[in-house]
Structure formats: structure tokens, C-alpha cells
A protein has these predicted regions:
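Thiol/selenol-based redox catalytic cores and closely related redox-interacting motifs
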Residues: 31-111
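Local sequence-structure signature of Cys/Sec-based thiol-disulfide redox active-site neighborhoods
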Residues: 1-21, 26-31
């Protein structure tokens, strides 16, 4: 299982803890520590069938000042989130052919 998350957010840490309870092998992609591959990011967004801005935290000041009213493509969203990790609204879990956008920590259970 792969978890794309922000280790500085409590909800993301809780999601990771639940994921560790259901899988012994977690590929942690902490966007504060590693530069997530553009390919993995693109795959996750496409499998979620969401627009790139749908995974962004619209209450974030950076979003309000720089993105609001625009519709960034996947590549633009990738670079914005990599440079501003707090923009990622919620963790994303990937396992086999499934991808789940974890709005709540327990959403990660949907991946099983």
C-alpha cells in the first residue's frame, strides 16, 4: 500500500496509523520529506476521477491568494503541492488497482 500524506497534519498521521494496522508494508510518501513522482501523482488523480484542484485545501491562504478562480491542470497542481505541502487536503491511499482520497482517517479502510 502507498500513502501520499503530509506528516505535519494530525489527520494525515491518523490515516497512516490506521493504514499500518491493516497492512504491514506501507510505502510512505510524506510530501514534506520526499519529492513524489509526477507519474504517481498523475495516476492517483486520474484514478480518483477528480480535478486537480479537488484535492487541494481551499481554505489554505496560498490557495486563496494564488489559485482561487483558476483551474490548474494536473502538472501545475503537482508543482504547487510539492512546493506547498499544506495544499494537499487529505491523504491519498493506493493499493493494487484502487485509489482512495481519505477525507477522514477511516476512509483508508475502503482500500481493502
Amino acid at each position: 500500500m502507498t500513502i501520499i500524506y503530509n506528516s505535519k497534519k494530525i489527520i494525515d498521521k491518523k490515516t497512516l496509523a490506521i493504514a499500518q494496522g491493516i497492512s504491514s508494508s506501507i510505502n510512505r510518501q510524506d510530501i514534506n520529506e520526499v519529492r513524489l513522482s509526477n507519474t504517481l501523482f498523475r495516476l492517483a488523480i486520474q484514478k480518483l476521477n477528480l480535478k486537480a484542484k479537488d484535492i487541494m485545501d481551499k481554505s489554505n491562504p496560498y490557495y486563496q491568494e494564488n489559485i482561487k478562480g483558476r483551474d490548474p491542470d494536473i502538472d501545475s497542481a503537482y508543482y504547487m503541492i510539492m512546493n506547498n505541502p499544506k495544499l494537499l487536503k487529505s491523504p491519498i491511499a493506493l493499493f493494487r488497482n484502487k485509489v482512495v482520497f481519505c477525507s477522514t482517517p477511516s476512509d483508508v479502510l475502503k482500500i481493502c
